[in-house]
Amino acid sequence: MKSQFGAAWERLYGPPIAHRGLWEPHGPPENSLGAFQAACAAGYNIELDVQLTADGEAMVFHDAKLDRMTGVEGRLSDHTAEDLGKTRLAGTDETIPTLAEALTLVGHKAMVHIEIKIPYGEVGPLERRVHEVLIDHNGPTSVIGFNPYSHSWFAEHHPGVLRGLNSYSYAGKDARNLAPELRKQYAELRHVAIAKPHFLALGLDMLPCAKADGFRKNGMPIIAWTAREPDQWNAVKGHCDNMIFEGFAP
């Protein structure tokens, strides 16, 4: 597997991964080209989020709704790529980039972990567009995400794409839309059998984890997320190979 993915596999182990780029409250906003440029300049790898627009483009943005980062009402999926590309982020001159724009900026300077943001049950269109973009980019990348069926889509259609399954304790209110049995299965990593990932990206709230330790012992890298202070990383680093971070300099 190491030889299959080359430099991308090596970069799973470092450098650390800047969560939504290297953004700051009074600097470049999250998931912006400025934040990605800052991460590259500092020598970090990058995690970013992608969603599908009304006209089928993969845009880099985290929330389903636009208001927190733009002041614009409504859902990203109701807007076109052209309109979103003119929408300013957090009152700055930065606008919402496409995935293609982000990857062009980064090039080979960093590994980019692309989190697929889709509602459960809507697998296919975003994955397909992400793969189309990846065809034109030869820098190190992976796709990550919580939906095991998104991963199984890539495993079936494009097995050469490096895949990382996200999971966590599924104990918070953000998991309330999932059935209790699914939350239990996912927290216990039983969905690994569906997703067939190459690595795991696990929330700090489920680490250390005996089952994850077993996967790691058998050669599957573990990335922890999201460390917001050094002590959080220090508490779990014996069970992980790398971290996604924000708010401090590792």
Which stretches of residues belong to each language-model region?
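Phosphate-group recognition and catalysis centered on beta-loop-alpha active-site segments
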Residues: 1-250
